[in-house]
Each structure stands twice: as C-alpha cells, then as structure tokens.
Amino acid sequence: SGGERQMVAMSRALMMDPSVLLLDEPSAGLSPVRQDDAFIRVSDINKAGVTTIMVEQNARRCLQICDRGYVLDQGKDAHEGTGRDLLNDPKVIGLYLGTLGTDAA
C-alpha cells in the first residue's frame, strides 16, 4: 500500500544518517495503528537529534510531537509557535476547522 511505501521510504532515508529529514505526510495511507507507529517513529527520530521538517494534515498529532510548528493559511505563514501554543490558539483552530478567512493572521 501507499502507506507501507511511506514507511519503507522513511527507513531508507534514515539509512543515510541524515542531519535533516524532510517528510511529506508520513501518516498518509496508513491504518490508525500504523499512523501511531509512524508518529512514534518520527518522535524518536527527532529525539535522536535529527532535525525533522514535516508536512502533515493531521495537525493535532503533528503538533503533539513537534518542538515548533508553522500553520499556513493560503500558502502564507499565519502562525508559529510550540505545539501546545498552536493547539490552544483560537485562530489556528479556526483555520483548521475552516471557520476563519484568510485575514486571520
């Protein structure tokens, strides 16, 4: 499946011992259990000192494991902060739920 290919691609990238890892939706196509595995793995990679830049649709999950997060609105940087700050920011929640326009920043 596409999700399994994601996990294999991540493993192959890690074999190169990178200092920075770029991930494009690492949980895409995975079952909920495998999504948990993917996020645990990303968290472990980050804790091991590998800078991880991730694009992810599952904002809540992503912000739970990241040190810093950036929320884009119409391709522009709208908000930046710790995961906790962003998860508690009403404007970010509004953007995520689609209840705020592009002038939310």
List each model region and its residues.
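C-terminal boundary and immediately downstream tail of ABC-type ATPase nucleotide-binding domains
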Residues: 71-72, 88-105
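A short, surface-exposed alpha-helical micro-motif characterized by mixed small hydrophobic
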Residues: 62-64
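A short, proline-enriched helix->beta-strand linker immediately N-terminal to the Walker B motif
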Residues: 15-19
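Catalytic Walker B motif of ABC-type/P-loop ATPase nucleotide-binding domains
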Residues: 21-25
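Hydrophobic anchor residue at the start of the ABC signature
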Residues: 10
